[in-house]
Amino acid sequence: MKEPKVSVGVMFEPKIEFILNSGFICNGAEYSGLQSVKLSGGKIEWLGKVFDELIFEPADGSISSFELKDVTIGINFHWERKENQLFKGSLKFIVEGEKITAINLLGVEEYLTSVISSEMSATASLELLKAHAVISRSWLLAQIDKNIEITNSSEKYSTMTESEGELIRWYDREDHTRFDICADDHCQRYQGITRASTPIVMDAIGQTRGELLMSEGKICDARYSKSCGGVFEEFQYCWEDKKYPYLVKQRDSKSDTIIPDLTVEKNAVEWIKESPESFCNTTDNKVLSQVLNNYDQETVNFYRWSVKYSQKELSQLILKRSGTDYGDILDLVPIERGTSGRLVKLKIVGTKRTRIIGKELEIRRTLSESHLYSSAFYVEKEMGSEQAPIAFTLKGAGWGHGVGLCQIGAAVMGEKGYNYKEILLHYFIGATINKMY
């Protein structure tokens, strides 16, 4: 197996400015310096001409780089912002809908160097970085294989089921059909060579080159999130109804392995109220700074957290985020939970409408201006003199979907002396680590 190439959708705008910092070849001629493309009649306008697509390939791949202006990072998250970003590899422009898409084409190992630097602090321990390199590589190649399967399947792939009383939707990277993955947290956080790559990041990539997590002869769909909250979630509760043997419930601990049945409401509430021992139950800034870049460190409470909304705030928020007018909110009723206590289905009861929503990310998006930390929460209502509650407090556990590697837990394991293979096999139960190229 040779090192694969990857295509990454970086930005989507009607007009894109970019700088070719050295010579790039396009349509047989060499260009450099400040350039601009814009949408014109469904095509790409550049230098007074229109094109269906454009590809800029580096004249000297070892030193060539390009810069994209005003790239949005953290799309729909609480720290969303724009920044200029620097990239190696080739640059491709295509038209999708009413926007131009900028795509970066490069080798998997070069891509991983950026992902590790973007997702993690470059000051993270070597073992944590090596574990993340194997996970990111595995996830990427598994998604490419999955996309090929979906493309070749006669069955239509759907990420949503909807009826009058229920909306169940999950979010995955399959809505990218013209490139492999996007550059934001929706897939893996990728910011080219904008973030500094230290020698330790390069070592982590090099020492694990070509290594993949495998299970039953296939590359593992190696998911990860910031904090599981103490128990791993299972794949089918967050995405399509498919079980993977390596993504199953387990305590994020070696000393305490007892797991209450968190699909039972009473048990889930008690679990969230507690703060049990787990690898990811830490407030150690040295450890947290390994996983959380500066903008992630704006989030302080993640293992256990709470959010309070007034009736007006919650009803307006749900209307804004879902597009559905429920009227005043009377109740938020848990219908189904996964193995970590995360809500899979939630009933929103309003004076105008009642509906069940899911899965976990749909719930998180509906109940927050960006993304609620997780769907592992219970609700406390504050009643007034009227029929509808005057306030709702959501008390929750963890940060993210909780499936696969828990980044903060893995950082703690690295600090405790576990090597990268031990870290990986703690979070991906029964998997193996194979060198494939």
Sequence positions of predicted segments:
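Conserved, single-site charged/polar hotspot
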Residues: 1-437
